[in-house]
């Protein structure tokens, strides 16, 4: 079947998530945000990484607003601070200026005093294009999150949580040796838990 090719899977699921109309997309983003706060998954954590939504991903802004209101330290990934394809994280405040990186994704301008490595995070919300019944995710193809998730797999220094629409579930993601399964993926309708 054609859906076994990772590039085809990416195109298919990116197109699928982009088809969700804006009104429903907004409701689903609020639903996920409420679900995260309702389940107490954020108890005893301080530093939370999240992503700026891009290319039809679930809108993280309602969650970011709630995190700020609850006084969590919110961090966004940054890839322009070096060229090693490793993500770092910058503190994100309501007045933080964002610029588009080379992939057209919004990120903060590098500032050493607001920069942390993934080891200093408690939770990392992870974007994905698709996911399967075992927690494996298909990303956009750059490998940035794959390299960070290896740190989770080895050190368990932060807890990664995938955020997705329900339509991004796939029964047949083509897994590669570098892929790391997420322990939790949250969709508007379901908590997928593998821990």
From Swiss-Prot:
Extent of the signal sequence: none
Transmembrane segments: none
Binding site residues for ATP: 6-10, 139-146, 179
GO molecular function: 5-formyltetrahydrofolate cyclo-ligase activity; ATP binding
Alphabetical keyword list: ATP-binding, Nucleotide-binding
GO biological process terms on file: folic acid-containing compound biosynthetic process; tetrahydrofolate interconversion
Keyword Acetylation: no
SUPFAM superfamilies: NagB/RpiA/CoA transferase-like
Gene3D superfamilies in the cross-refs: NagB/RpiA/CoA transferase-like
Family designation: Belongs to the 5-formyltetrahydrofolate cyclo-ligase family.
NCBIfam families reported for this sequence: MTHFS_bact
Record-given protein name: Uncharacterized protein bbp_370
Organism: Buchnera aphidicola subsp. Baizongia pistaciae (strain Bp)
């Amino acid at each position: 079947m054609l859906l076994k090719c990772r590039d085809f899977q990416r195109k298919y699921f990116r197109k699928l998530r982009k088809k969700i109309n804006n009104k429903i997309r907004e409701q689903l983003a609020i639903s996920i945000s409420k679900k995260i706060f309702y389940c107490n998954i954020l108890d005893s954590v301080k530093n939370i990484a999240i992503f700026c939504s891009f290319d039809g991903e679930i809108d993280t802004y309602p969650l970011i607003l709630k995190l700020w209101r609850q006084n969590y330290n919110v961090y966004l990934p940054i890839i322009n601070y070096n060229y090693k394809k490793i993500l770092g994280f910058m503190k994100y405040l309501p007045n933080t200026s964002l610029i588009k990186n080379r992939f057209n994704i919004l990120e903060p301008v590098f500032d050493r005093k607001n920069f942390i490595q993934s080891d200093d995070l408690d939770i990392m919300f992870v974007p994905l294009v698709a996911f399967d019944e075992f927690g494996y995710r298909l990303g956009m193809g750059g490998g940035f999150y794959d390299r960070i998730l290896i740190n989770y797999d080895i050190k368990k220094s932060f807890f990664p949580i995938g955020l997705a629409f329900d339509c991004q579930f796939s029964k047949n993601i083509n897994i590669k040796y570098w892929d790391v399964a997420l322990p939790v993926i949250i969709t508007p309708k379901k908590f997928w838990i593998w821990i």
